[in-house]
Design a protein with these regions (language model features):
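ATP-dependent helicase/translocase motor core
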Residues: 1-74, 83, 87-98, 116-119, ...
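Conserved SAM-binding loop
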Residues: 22, 77, 147
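An acidic- and aromatic-residue-enriched active-site/binding cleft used to recognize and process polar
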Residues: 50-52, 80-82, 150, 174-175
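A generic local structural motif
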Residues: 63-64, 71, 105-109, 130-135, ...
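Anion-binding and metal-coordination hotspots
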Residues: 78, 92, 214-217
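Conserved helicase motor
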Residues: 79-82, 103-112, 124-129
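Signature of the SF2 helicase/ATPase Hel1-core->accessory helical subdomain module
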Residues: 128-134, 138-234
């Protein structure tokens, strides 16, 4: 089914937690991903969101929409610290409870539980130990891979793990790195191809298939402060 067949309103997750409503900017981000997924067959997305604007809730709603519309059966959510994995599980454990979310570091001791879960939360470090991601999963095990703090997880060894998985990729970050904006790539590739390659490897927008400086959806700190219905109460 189209991703947009699963309609999104502010009440989308209320049945799991009556005190939680989606804000309009979260609904807009969810719908822009669905529009590009359905209409443009896009499979890479970058969501720029200021700190404190509800990234985890947005991710839970994203995952729920992919699972309920049958556009994903298994989802990997990558964070860069175990504390974040635990915090994420607190929210996922409520909204995604029907899908048996697990923390990879704990669940890998029980392979059946790990392989049977629809939602796996993992630190990039735990996936990288002894290249576990290659030994325990196939490239197509996860239909959806979401990267929290995406500007960090595309560097060095971490990049290998993220690129290994072939599912739809969504990156979230408050601080995307733009190394290709206002760069004449045609000129640079002739003058210094290695410099261009270095910029491409470090550019968050490029990694997630977006034009330089243009994420799939943006709700930065300026938007948050100006928004009368936003998360910041001044």
């Amino acid at each position: 089914s189209p991703l947009s067949s699963e309609e999104i309103t502010e009440n989308y997750v209320k049945s799991f937690n009556p005190s939680i409503s989606l804000r309009q900017y979260q609904i807009d981000a969810l719908n822009e991903v669905a529009r590009q997924f359905d209409n443009d067959s896009k499979r890479q997305f970058l969501l720029e969101m200021a700190t404190g604007t509800g990234k985890t809730l947005l991710c839970a709603a994203l995952i729920l929409r992919f699972l309920k519309s049958n556009n994903a059966q298994r989802v990997l959510f990558i964070v860069d610290r175990i504390e974040l994995a635990k915090q994420t599980m607190e929210e996922f454990g409520v909204i995604l409870r029907d899908y048996g979310p697990v923390i990879y570091k704990n669940a890998r001791k029980h392979p059946a539980e790990l392989l049977g879960s629809s939602v796996v939360v993992a630190t990039i470090q735990s996936l990288m130990v002894d290249k576990r991601f290659r030994k325990e999963f196939t490239p197509f095990h996860f239909d959806l891979v979401i990267n929290d703090e995406a500007h960090r997880s595309i560097y060095g060894d971490s990049r290998e793990a993220v690129q290994f998985f072939q599912g739809t990729k969504i990156g979230l970050t408050a601080t995307p790195k733009a190394y290709l904006k206002n760069i004449d790539t045609g000129k640079l590739v002739k003058e210094n191809p290695k410099a261009l390659e270095a910029r491409q490897l470090r550019d968050t927008y490029n990694f997630f298939g977006c034009e330089p400086g243009e994420p799939t959806s943006r709700y930065d700190i300026i938007d948050a402060v100006k928004d009368p219905d936003g998360p910041y109460l001044c």
